[in-house]
């Protein structure tokens, strides 16, 4: 698991916005569209297309207590899923988070 942990942590730290996603997930597509509207290009790891996707999702659950996708991080901080991203957009906190990118 330490190899997976190292990989996930590196992705989170090296991408200002990092999304762990599944290519077919409608919530992931909505989150990607929301970020695109804000001119944000997230790093994306499509778990269903990654040979280590299941292990990555297991580690993310351990790290965040969230077992669903999308699983979004901004500047290394866990934001949550699509509903959390949309709530942050609606209350203005998302604009503040991405302003410093």
UniProtKB/Swiss-Prot annotation:
Gene Ontology MF term list = glutathione disulfide oxidoreductase activity
Arranged from A to Z, the UniProt key words for this protein are: Cytoplasm, Disulfide bond, Electron transport, Redox-active center, Transport
Q: What induces it?
A: Up-regulation of expression first detected at 24 hours after exposure to copper and reaches to a maximum after 7 days. Up-regulation of expression reaches to a maximum at 12 hours after exposure to paraquat and returns to basal levels within 24 hours.
Q: What cystine pairs are annotated?
A: 25-28
Kindly indicate whether the keyword Cytoplasm belongs to this entry: yes
| Classification via PROSITE patterns | GLUTAREDOXIN_1, GLUTAREDOXIN_2
Q: SUPFAM superfamilies recorded for this chain?
A: Thioredoxin-like
Which parts of the sequence belong to the Glutaredoxin domain?
5-101
InterPro entries from the UniProt entry: GLR_AS (IPR011767), Glutaredoxin (IPR002109), Glutaredoxin_euk/vir (IPR011899), Glutaredoxin_subgr (IPR014025), Thioredoxin-like_sf (IPR036249)
GO cellular component terms, A-Z: cytosol; nucleus
Where is this chain primarily localised?
A: cytoplasm
Q: Which domain of life is it from?
A: Eukaryota
Give one Pfam hit by family name: Glutaredoxin
Coiled-coil positions are: none
Q: Where in the cell is it found?
A: Cytoplasm, Cytosol
Its GO biological process terms?
A: cellular response to oxidative stress
Q: So what family is this one in?
A: Belongs to the glutaredoxin family.
PANTHER family named in the record: GLUTAREDOXIN 2, GLUTAREDOXIN-1-RELATED
General function of this protein: Multifunctional enzyme with glutathione-dependent oxidoreductase, glutathione peroxidase and glutathione S-transferase (GST) activity. The disulfide bond functions as an electron carrier in the glutathione-dependent synthesis of deoxyribonucleotides by the enzyme ribonucleotide reductase. In addition, it is also involved in reducing cytosolic protein- and non-protein-disulfides in a coupled system with glutathione reductase. May play a role in protection against oxidative stress caused by superoxide in vivo by regulating the redox state of the protein sulfhydryl groups.
What name appears for this protein in its UniProt entry? Answer: Glutaredoxin-1
* Higher taxonomy: Eukaryota, Fungi, Fungi incertae sedis, Mucoromycota, Glomeromycotina
